[in-house]
Regions:
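A composition-driven surface/loop motif
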Residues: 1-220
C-alpha cells in the first residue's frame, strides 16, 4: 500500500497513517522510518512476526507510534537473535519491539512478545499501555521506557529471566521541565516475574487508582 516499501521480507512504513498487519511474517521485519512529525498506528489483526537478524518491529523514526492489537485477535512478536544481555541494553534495536520515539500499546486484543536477545518491549522515550492484553518474556528487561512507563489499564504479564520487569533508565529533567524516569500505574492487572527488580525506576514509582500489581522476584 501507499506509505509502505518492501524489500524481501522487510516492510518499511514511511509516512503517517494507519497500517494493518495480518498473517505470518517469518524471518521478517516491520520498520517505521517516517518523518519527525509523523504519527503512525500499526493495527495487529492476527499476526506473527519473527526475526533472527534484528528487532521484528523496529521504529527508527517517527513522532509517535501506536501498536493496536485488534479485539479478539492473538498477535505474537518473537525476537530470535542469540542472547546478548550486556550493558548495551539501551542500544537501538535491543528489543523485540523497539522504538526511538513515544510508543503506545493499545487495543483489546492479545499481544505476546518474546525477547530472546535482550529486552522485550522498549521505547527510547515514553512507553504507555492501555486496555491491551500483553505478555512479555525477555532475557533482560521485559518492559522498558527509557524516559517513562505509564500503565493505565489492561492485563499485563512481564517476565524477565535476568533483568527487571518494568524499567526506566533516564532521570533527567526534560526541556519542558518534566521529570523523566517515572513508572506510573493507574490501573490494570499487572503480574511481574523478575530476576532482579520487579520495577526499577530511574526516578520514582507512582501507583494510584484501582489496579492490581503483583511482583515476584526469583529465577524464571
Amino acid at each position: 500500500s501507499d506509505g509502505v516499501t518492501q524489500s524481501g521480507s522487510v516492510y518499511t512504513i514511511t509516512k503517517a497513517g494507519e497500517y494493518t498487519v495480518a498473517g505470518l511474517l517469518s524471518e521478517g521485519q516491520l520498520i517505521v522510518d517516517a518523518g519527525d512529525e509523523d504519527e503512525i498506528t500499526i493495527v495487529l489483526n492476527g499476526t506473527s512476526i519473527t526475526c533472527s537478524s534484528g528487532s521484528p518491529i523496529y521504529v527508527k523514526n517517527a513522532s509517535e507510534v501506536k501498536i493496536k492489537s485488534e479485539e479478539n485477535t492473538f498477535n505474537e512478536v518473537i525476537d530470535k537473535r542469540a542472547e546478548a544481555t550486556d550493558d548495551s541494553s539501551d542500544d537501538a534495536g535491543n528489543a523485540a519491539i523497539y522504538a526511538t520515539c513515544d510508543l503506545k500499546l493499545v487495543g483489546k486484543g492479545a499481544l505476546v512478545v518474546t525477547g530472546n536477545y535482550n529486552n522485550g518491549i522498549q521505547s527510547k522515550d515514553d512507553l504507555s499501555i492501555k486496555n491491551v492484553i500483553v505478555k512479555v518474556t525477555a532475557v533482560n528487561n521485559a518492559i522498558k521506557g527509557n524516559d517513562a512507563v505509564d500503565i493505565e489499564s489492561g492485563n499485563i504479564i512481564a517476565i524477565s529471566a535476568k533483568g527487571d520487569g518494568i524499567k526506566t533508565s533516564n532521570s533527567s529533567i526534560s526541556n519542558k521541565d518534566n521529570q523523566k524516569g517515572i513508572v506510573t500505574i493507574t490501573g490494570g492487572n499487572i503480574d511481574v516475574y523478575a530476576a532482579c527488580d520487579g520495577i526499577d525506576a530511574a526516578y520514582g514509582v507512582d501507583i494510584s487508582g484501582d489496579g492490581n500489581l503483583n511482583i515476584y522476584t526469583d529465577t524464571y
